[in-house]
């Protein structure tokens, strides 16, 4: 993670309002100094590559804007959205950018430099766990070393494909990224590897292959979604919608009968709840299709 250029060094703030299906990002431009004085800043949609669609700026202001955007390109918020479109980036770095930048994009963080410290502390905690090496399951999907990280990034990709579509285009981008990054944290330290005998269909010989099982002493005390929400809320200040999305991301697959009403109410009230459910299922479906080929 690069050294943070603090917001008080910017004349203009860049607030993403659309990922545009991962092709480019549309930003809302805010005059940072005016905003800090409590007034309404100037607003414009800009294309990050050209900045040509910004209206109402003179040549001096346009030069200042370009300088600010170049500085902004080292900020976690920018790196998070760029990482979504980078398929060849190191997956651990990609996840770090998306988690940290995603949290800094949330309304409760409000581009606060304090939010950067909070997110970095969460990363430091993750580094003490097996998150980056754990499987996503024992058999159903991504049941291999690093599978949990791979699945999480796939969910982020699916979410980015959906978020600009109705009815999800009102969802806060930061909340969406944080919920995707944290939705399966309950699986941290859940599995252990062992060697399993498997018959090679080509040679007919039995071979030992690495497999995973749930640790005997490990159980999810609060349930799948609630456990992930609990861990995420220990690290971040979550909005109710973000917390609900993590809590209910399994949809009807992990809900008691007497909880169905609460699930349906959250689906109706919070678009992010359904968005994360769809992204999670789409990721698993894509995995299954790829395995069949």
Language-model-detected regions and their locations in the chain:
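Short, acidic/polar N-cap/turn motifs at the starts of alpha helices
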Residues: 2, 12-14
């Amino acid at each position: 993670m690069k050294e943070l250029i603090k917001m008080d060094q910017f004349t203009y703030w860049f607030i993403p309002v659309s990922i545009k299906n991962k092709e480019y990002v549309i930003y809302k431009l805010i005059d940072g100094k005016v905003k800090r004085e409590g007034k309404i800043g100037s607003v414009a949609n800009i294309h990050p590559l050209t900045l040509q669609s910004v209206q109402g700026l003179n040549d001096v202001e346009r030069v200042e804007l370009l300088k600010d955007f170049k500085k902004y390109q080292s900020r976690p918020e920018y790196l998070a959205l760029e990482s979504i479109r980078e398929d060849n980036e190191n997956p651990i770095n990609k996840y770090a950018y998306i988690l940290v930048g995603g949290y800094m994009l949330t309304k409760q963080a409000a581009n606060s430099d304090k939010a950067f410290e909070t997110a970095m502390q969460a990363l430091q905690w993750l580094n003490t766990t097996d998150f980056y090496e754990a499987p996503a399951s024992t058999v159903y999907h991504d049941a291999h070393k690093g599978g949990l990280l791979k699945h999480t990034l796939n969910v982020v990709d699916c979410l980015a494909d959906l978020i600009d579509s109705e009815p999800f285009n009102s969802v806060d981008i930061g909340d969406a990224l944080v919920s995707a990054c944290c939705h399966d944290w309950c699986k941290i330290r859940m599995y252990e590897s062992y060697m399993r005998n498997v018959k090679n269909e080509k040679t007919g010989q039995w071979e030992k292959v690495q497999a995973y099982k749930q640790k005997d002493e490990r159980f999810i005390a609060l349930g799948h979604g609630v456990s992930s929400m609990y861990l995420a809320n220990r690290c971040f200040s979550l909005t109710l919608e973000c917390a609900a999305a993590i809590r209910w991301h399994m949809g009807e697959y992990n809900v008691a009968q007497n909880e169905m009403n609460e699930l349906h109410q959250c689906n109706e009230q919070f678009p992010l709840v359904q968005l994360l459910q769809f992204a999670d299922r789409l990721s698993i479906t894509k995995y299954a299709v790829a395995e069949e080929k």
